[in-house]
Amino acid sequence: MSWQAYVDDHLLCDIEGNHLTHAAIIGQDGSVWAQSTDFPQFKPEEITAIMNDFNEPGSLAPTGLYLGGTKYMVIQGEPGAVIRGKKGPGGVTVKKTGAALIIGIYDEPMTPGQCNMVVERPGDYLIDQGY
């Protein structure tokens, strides 16, 4: 299965009538493996900051998580594995695998829990597969 099919079929899937607004799988170096249409154009330093938070959990909390210039307030995640952010009625979940970052961005009516499930479950699978 191609990475684009993974984004289209697994990350943008329908959950109780809701789905992610944007999704992407990117390398930990910031290279895009696959992304949804109109995924925010992120800056290399934003990915560097995300990777730094995985290596030093809590480093994003004072400044916020930026993705495509949008600031998200960092909320409780799983240190070294998952970063979660909130902005108004929506938010973002970033799951780290061995080689990639899986990113899901959502808005209401999707819930944070639905976003977490959609992003983290495939992430766990990719970890099991060596990615």
Swiss-Prot record:
Keyword Cytoplasm carried by entry: yes
Domain of life: Eukaryota
Family classification: Belongs to the profilin family.
Function: Binds to actin and affects the structure of the cytoskeleton. At high concentrations, profilin prevents the polymerization of actin, whereas it enhances it at low concentrations. By binding to PIP2, it inhibits the formation of IP3 and DG.
Keywords attached to this entry: Actin-binding, Allergen, Cytoplasm, Cytoskeleton
Subunit field text: Occurs in many kinds of cells as a complex with monomeric actin in a 1:1 ratio.
Source lineage: Eukaryota, Viridiplantae, Streptophyta, Embryophyta, Tracheophyta
Protein name, UniProt field: Profilin-1
Originating gene: PRO1
SUPFAM superfamilies: Profilin (actin-binding protein)
GO CC terms of this entry: cell cortex; cytoskeleton
